């Protein structure tokens, strides 16, 4: 498949075995605003629930509404991602499959989250900035290019792509169903 940039490195740790519950993990979607992270994550959550998983979705917009004073500087973003990562790790420890969708632009903070989790699966939604801008229903990229939004990832603030994600998906030209299938196939051990 041309949109899947790398094959999974090892057998998936979460596939359900003959009548047993899906093992908990932290499935961490990262990528630019408008890349498709949250949309795919919501579909994956739905599919995991249908398979009987105890699953929780942690999303960037939702979490920022809970922590409204979180800023967009590098240090504020790092602190926020580590806070969410701690929560994700605790949920996983208590048997919950966590699906997280955050821009999470810095490798160091994503690596810190990985260290807090038993099974961390990084999904890099690698959709190019040009496609993300084309999809931008909220007009955030336009505002960022006009200087009305500072520290906007991909425009005035960097995005550090993962070096070794478990899965990378460029959603350009893909349907949500196709993208979701790539993730579910990975999780269920189908290559």
Task: Label each residue range with its predicted role.
Residues 42-89, 93:
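Conserved substrate/cofactor phosphate-moiety recognition/catalytic segment
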Residues 37:
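Conserved lysine of the Walker
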Residues 57, 120-122, 166-168:
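Conserved beta-strand scaffold positions in the cores of enzyme catalytic domains, especially
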Residues 1-26:
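Extreme N-terminal, non-catalytic leader segments
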Residues 29:
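Hydrophobic anchor at the beta1->P-loop junction of P-loop NTPases
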Residues 66, 70-71, 88-145, 151:
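ATP-dependent NMP and nucleoside kinases share a basic, alpha-helical "lid"
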Residues 33:
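The conserved Walker
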Residues 126-129, 134-182, 189-190:
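Small-molecule kinase domains that catalyze NTP-dependent phosphoryl transfer to phosphate-bearing small molecules
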């Amino acid at each position: 498949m041309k949109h899947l940039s790398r094959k999974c490195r090892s057998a998936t740790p979460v596939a359900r075995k003959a009548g047993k519950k899906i093992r908990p993990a932290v499935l961490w979607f990262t990528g630019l605003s408008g890349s498709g992270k949250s949309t795919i994550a919501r579909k994956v959550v739905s599919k995991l629930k249908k398979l009987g998983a105890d699953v929780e979705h942690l999303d960037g917009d939702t979490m920022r509404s809970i922590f409204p004073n979180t800023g967009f500087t590098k240090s504020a973003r790092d602190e926020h991602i580590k806070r969410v990562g701690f929560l994700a790790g605790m949920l996983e420890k208590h048997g919950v499959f966590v699906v997280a969708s955050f821009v999470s632009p810095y490798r160091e903070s994503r690596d810190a989250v990985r260290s807090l989790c038993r099974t961390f699966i990084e999904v890099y939604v690698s959709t190019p900035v040009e496609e993300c801008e084309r999809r931008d229903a909220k007009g955030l990229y336009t505002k960022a290019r006009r200087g009305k939004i500072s520290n906007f990832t991909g425009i005035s603030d960097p995005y550090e792509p993962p070096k070794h994600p478990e899965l990378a998906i460029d959603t350009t030209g893909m349907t949500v169903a196709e993208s979701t299938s790539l993730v579910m196939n990975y999780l269920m051990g189908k290559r």
